[in-house]
Amino acid sequence: MASFLLSTLVFFLAALILVPQGLAQYHLNPVYEAPVNGPPVNKPPQKETPVQKPPQKEPPVHKSPRNEPPRHKPPHKKSHLHVTKRSYGKHATEEHSIHF
């Protein structure tokens, strides 16, 4: 009998601890509660302090030597196929005509 009363008492205390407001507001309609927090405050963004990191040395990269382009344009050489402009005007004379 004592164990039954003790277990009932423990069960009742556990119910009160685990569900403190469930039994009290079971039949009540939900009531709107205003938020506890105030309106948001505009704060300037916090600047993070820079973290000093040791410099990392990268291994040297092997680059093949390159020939630099000439700085000055070389003089133009006339090829043996170069054809000079004719000395006559728009129309060729009979001497320069190749038609037979």
From Swiss-Prot:
Residues 39-78 are annotated as: 8 X 5 AA approximate tandem repeats of P-P-[VQHR]-[NKH]-[EK]. Sequence repeats lie at residues 39-43, 44-48, 49-53, 54-58, 59-63, 64-68, 69-73, 74-78. Keywords: Cell wall, Nodulation, Repeat, Secreted, Signal. GO terms for cellular component: extracellular region. Residues 72-89 have a biased composition (Basic residues). InterPro entries: Proline-rich_CW_protein. The keyword Repeat applies. Residues 55-71, 91-100 have a biased composition (Basic and acidic residues). Residues 1-24 form the signal peptide. Residues 32-100 are annotated as: Disordered. Belongs to the plant proline-rich protein superfamily. ENOD12 family. PANTHER family: PROLINE-RICH EXTENSIN-LIKE PROTEIN EPR1, REPETITIVE PROLINE-RICH CELL WALL PROTEIN 3. This is Early nodulin-12. It comes from Vicia sativa (Spring vetch). The gene is ENOD12.
